[in-house]
Amino acid sequence: MMMLPEACVANILAFTSPADAFSSSEVSSVFRLAGDSDFVWEKFLPSHYKSLISQSTDHHRIFSSKKEIYRCLCDSLLIDNARKLFKINKFSGKISYILSARDISITYSDHASYCSWSNVSDSRFSESAELITTDRLEIKGKIQTTVLSPNTKYGAYLIMKVTNGAYGLDLVPAETSVKSKNGQNNKNTTYLCCLDEKKQQMKRLFYGNREERMAMTVEAVGGDGKRREPKARDDGWLEIELGEFVTREGEDDEVNMSLTEVKGYQLKGGIVIDGIEVRPIPLK
C-alpha cells in the first residue's frame, strides 16, 4: 500500500468514509496528498452542495478545495434566506437540517398579542418566536427526504426554551407526530416542561386531581407509561422529540412533523421556539 501511486490511493479512499480520509494523512505523505484531493472529497460531498452554497448567506466565499467545502458544511451553513441551517457530520457525512421558527408554522405567530419575535442571543437564527399566551398550540414543519442522507434513520426535535414566567405547560400533555406521505407514522405525547415536584405538590393541594382529569383529554399513545418531557441540549436549549422516520435510496417523500395541544383549552405561555431539527439517529 505504501508504494501505490497517489491516484490509486485516492481512488481507494473515495470508497471509504470521511473519517478514514481525515485520518489517512497520518499514514504517509502519499496518503496525505491523496486524502486532500478534490477527487476524494467530491465523493463525500452532498450531491446538491453547489446549490446549498449558492443559497447560503456566505455564497460569495471562494473555496480553495473540495475538502475546504466539506469542512465548511461540517461547521454548518445558513441557507434559504437564513431560514434553515444545513450541516453534515464530520466523520459520517450524514446530513442534518434545522428549520428555523420562521420556516415552520406556529399558531398565531403573526398576532403580536399572542406571539412575539425577537433575537435570542444563543439562537442560530436572527429571530425566535416566544409564545405569550394561547389556549391552542400547533407547531408544524415539513421536509423532503431527497435533501437528506438516504437509507438513514432520522429523528425530529423541537428546539425550545421555557421562560421564567412560563405557565400552563404542565397540565395537559401535547401530542407529537411524524408522518410521511409514503405511510410512516410515529405518534406520542409529551409535556412542554420538566416536572417540578414542589409545584406539583402545591397544585395537588389547591386543585386536587384537576391535572389528572385534564390529562385524560389526550389519548395515551406512548404505551410505556413514561412521562415524556423536554431534554437539555449541549447548546443551552431544550428539545422535545417529535418522532422518527427512515429515508430510502431513490425515494422522494414528504415528512410532516408536528406538536399540538388543542384539547385542554388551557391558557399557556412562556415557550421560546427556535425551530425543528432533523438529524440522523446514531446506530446503537
Curated annotation (Swiss-Prot):
Describe the location of the F-box domain by residue ranges.
1-44
Domain of life, per UniProt, equals Eukaryota
Which protein, by its recorded name, is this?
F-box protein PP2-B13
Extract the InterPro entries matched here.
Answer: F-box-like_dom_sf (IPR036047), F-box_dom (IPR001810), PP2-like (IPR025886)
Q: Which organism is it from?
A: Arabidopsis thaliana
One Pfam entry for this protein is: PP2
Q: Which GO terms describe its molecular function?
A: carbohydrate binding
